[in-house]
Amino acid sequence: MATMMGCSTASSTKMTHTEWCKTRYEAAEELYKAKKYGRTVEKLEEILSTCAGSGYMEQAQFLLAESQFNLEHWIEARGEYGSFIVNFPGSPFAETAEFRKAVSSFNMDYRIDRDESNTTTAMKDFERYLANHPNTPLRDSVNYYYNLLVDRVAEKEFQTGRLYLRMEKPQAAVIYFKEYLETYPKAKHRQEALFLISDAYTDLDQFDPARQYLAIAQNEADKDEKILKRINKANDKIASAEESYEKRLKKESEKKRLQKEEKKLAE
């Protein structure tokens, strides 16, 4: 009888809410360790919706963000890291969460022919991270990502300038190339931009600035024969364009003179 009563008592013992949450969290953790991130996400979302006050919310929120990160669901990962930072700012995982939030932003969909809002968002995330953690050991990694983001913005400026040049809008091209050269002096397309802005000024019949930018290209060529050959060719193009421009001016001037004389004779 005693044995039967003991079994009855044990079987009727109810699991507490905290114990239930602990069991669920440990199961999610095992799935995460097994790299079953999709199933991990499902378990953790259940915990977050049912385990408030259990003591497992912080771990669950962070592990959910990590799972989305490993799934390369960048928008979701950024959102979960952001929620973690807001809800648990004093957590020992907060700095890691803020860094990975920025990395998630960096990895969000990017195409050169689209707007650069994702790039701007990522830059702000890294800037905020450094402002909040100035002594971080991850500074080199932050600088690496940030420089790549700067390259993206520079590339957009450069490609926009090229587009305007192809559209035969040299004045707009000059604006973008000047901005590119002044803002990103070490950008990878700097040399090409010097040639293209020279072409744009030539198209505008502004030959002095066209030659000035070629002179900069020559100073930076460092005896590169291929570049020097291209510079000589560009100078010849400017000279030819200038000669045609002067002939055109002379012709127009002569036309105006004749029109003026004809008008006098008609009076």
Residue ranges, per PLM feature:
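Acidic, polar-rich low-complexity tracts and alpha-helical solenoid repeat scaffolds
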Residues: 6-267
